[in-house]
Amino acid sequence: MIVEQQYIDLFSQTEAMICKHSAEVLNAPRAAAFADFERLGFPTRKREKYKYTDVSKYFEPDYGLNLNRLAIPVNPYEVFKCDVPNMSTALYFVVNDAFYNRALPKVNLPEGVIFGSLKEVAGQHPELVKKYYGQLADTSKDGVTAFNTAFAQDGVVFYVPKNVVVEKPIQLVNILRADVNFMVNRRVLIILEDGAQARLLICDHAMDNVNFLATQVIEVFAGENTVFDMYELEETHTSTVRISNLYVKQEANSNVLLNGMTLHNGTTRNTTEVLLAGEGAEINLCGMAIADKNQHVDNHTSIDHAVPNCTSNELFKYVLDDQSVGAFAGLVLVRPDAQHTNSQQTNRNLCATRDARMYTQPQLEIYADDVKCSHGATVGQLDEGALFYMRSRGIAEKEARLLLMFAFVNEVIDTIRLEALKDRLHLLVEKRFRGELNRCQGCAICK
């Protein structure tokens, strides 16, 4: 465990500092999480779950960490240029891994709704955060989750009380800002009580072209009869590594839509684990990745049908160019008591060059006999027949290829239930295919 040793030493030397600049609720599980990290280490390809991405190697370089919580000299409102200008949102920022609340414009949210710093909310409402924090993100099973829990000092809490509807979408912008190679450990806690409804857009941007390593753990609790949409849009630099673990628990008759879109990145590893714990729960899990050069995108999903009468729909699409690498592994588990399960899983992929590589592993484990489940995966190239037809109608070959690729990913974009975001994504994807979106576009400093 050579890679891990530098972080073991670092934690031993700085644990008091880490705790000093955090909150008691976050500090309580820190020692146990660190012990789990010491035991597990960082995942390597030897673990089946990580066989397409060697996470361990990305922790080898030296990175700076802001454990003393020094102020970052940046005003997000001056440098951030929203890529969704026509969508009215309640806008918030996280700079590196700290919630930005300096000179924050007042946002009018419904009574009882909380959106703010995890550290501050944990101090103001310790019982609320304690009830949920770390309950889904099991540090005993994943080394990255254990590492994040040991080092995370702040993050975001989004709490919606019972039967409250948040009409205006919430937009959370994660900005990476540093002058040296830098590591951040982000944390997001989302709680929707019974009958609540909300929509959240999370955007990842990098202001500087240094090497960034971002670990992220998101926990989502969706109570009975809730409706929750969460969209993640990644537009960072090729020198950015993102390792994200998302945990979701749904109660009876909840409806959750998760859509993660990687438009530009360096290396991305996303893990999504969904537990359908109440009858009538429905999860729609979607993803899209567009990669070129040496970019790497790996999505690993798990949907656990633990009770009867639940529905899961899963759709992931990749377009890979140059020497880029994509991976998708999706498990749907139907437990013995989960009768009347309805589950569909689809993974479709386009490799635009011979050097692009796509690995796909759909998997069903069914232990109930009265279910309706299907899965399918394909890896191929553009339809030559369609290309020939379009060229015969006077469309240039390059333009025809762009149109076919755009049509291919359009199915994922159309799952978005925010019209302004959907319209903007159509434009951003077209620009990405035309090579006009080849770096972070979210910050005015990136010109």
Where do the protein language model's features map onto the residues?
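Short, low-to-moderate order helix/coil transition modules at the start of elongated helical scaffolds
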Residues: M1-V217, N225-V227
